[in-house]
C-alpha cells in the first residue's frame, strides 16, 4: 500500500484517482485539479473565469458542429484545432488554414482557438507545496520542430524584457494558486506585442524543464517530490 500518489502524465483515469482519494489516499496534484487540466475546454474556461489572459476559443461537441459553425462563417481561418483530451507534444493539434483542412479530423470533442502571431513561446515551471510555499524556475524560451511540433531547443534564460519576465512569473504563480495545484505546474505561454497569453498548462515535469537536471541546484523532478511531500522547496537557480 501507499499513502501518497502522483503521476507522470495527465492522461490517466481521473475517476480512479478520485476513488483513491475517497479511500483516504493523498493524490498530488489532486483529481479536482487534474479534471480541469485534462480537458482543454475546461482548462480554457478556467482561464477565462479566473481572468487569465488566453486566446479566444470555441468548443464543439463533434465535427458536425464545427462544420455548421464554418458554414455560418463563425470560424476565422487560419485557426488552431485541438482535441479536448489526450493531446500533447504536438499530437491532437492542427493548424486549419481553410475548411478543407477539417476533412480528416477525428469526430471528437474539440476546441478551435484564434491563431496568435506570437514572437516567442515561453514556459515557466512553478512548484507549490501544501503549506502554500511557491517557487518558479527561470522563464525559458521554447523553439519547436516544424514537422513534429515538439520542443527542440530551450533557451534559458529567455531573451525577454524584465517586464515580460515578471509578468510570466506572476501568471505562473497565479495559475498554481488558482488551480490549488500541489506539485509542479508547467505553464506554456505566447509572447505577442510585449503581452502574454497562456497557451496551456501541464501538472508534471515538462520538456522545457529537463535542463534543470544539469543547470539548476534543484531539478524539476526533485522539486516535484519536495513539493508533494510538503518539504521546503529547493533552490531553482
Q: What positions do the PLM features span?
A:
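Short, flexible active-site loops
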Residues: 148-159, 200-213
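Conserved N-proximal alpha/beta basic substrate-recognition cap immediately N-terminal to
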Residues: 1-68, 72, 86-87
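A short linear hydrophobic-aromatic micro-motif
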Residues: 56, 78-81, 110-113, 185-186, ...
Amino acid at each position: 500500500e501507499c499513502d501518497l500518489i502522483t503521476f507522470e502524465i495527465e492522461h490517466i483515469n481521473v475517476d480512479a484517482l478520485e476513488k483513491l482519494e475517497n479511500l483516504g489516499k493523498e493524490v498530488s496534484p489532486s483529481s479536482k485539479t487534474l479534471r480541469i487540466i485534462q480537458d482543454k475546454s475546461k482548462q480554457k474556461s478556467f482561464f477565462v473565469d479566473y481572468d487569465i489572459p488566453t486566446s479566444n476559443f470555441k468548443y464543439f461537441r463533434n465535427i458536425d458542429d464545427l462544420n455548421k459553425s464554418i458554414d455560418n462563417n463563425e470560424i476565422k481561418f487560419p485557426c488552431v484545432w485541438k482535441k479536448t483530451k489526450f493531446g500533447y507534444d504536438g499530437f491532437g493539434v492542427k493548424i486549419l488554414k481553410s475548411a478543407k483542412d477539417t476533412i480528416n479530423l477525428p469526430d471528437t470533442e474539440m476546441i478551435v482557438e484564434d491563431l496568435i502571431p506570437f514572437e516567442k513561446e515561453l514556459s515557466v515551471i512553478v512548484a507549490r507545496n501544501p503549506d502554500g510555499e511557491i517557487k518558479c524556475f527561470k522563464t525559458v524560451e521554447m523553439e519547436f520542430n516544424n514537422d513534429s511540433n515538439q520542443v527542440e531547443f530551450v533557451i534559458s534564460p529567455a531573451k525577454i524584457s524584465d517586464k515580460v519576465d515578471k509578468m510570466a512569473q506572476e501568471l505562473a504563480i497565479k495559475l498554481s494558486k488558482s488551480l490549488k495545484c500541489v506539485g509542479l505546474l508547467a505553464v506554456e505561454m505566447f509572447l505577442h506585442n510585449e503581452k502574454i497569453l497562456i497557451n496551456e498548462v501541464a501538472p508534471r515535469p515538462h520538456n522545457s524543464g529537463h535542463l534543470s537536471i544539469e543547470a539548476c541546484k534543484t531539478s524539476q523532478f526533485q522539486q516535484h517530490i519536495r513539493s508533494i511531500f510538503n518539504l521546503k522547496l529547493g533552490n531553482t537557480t
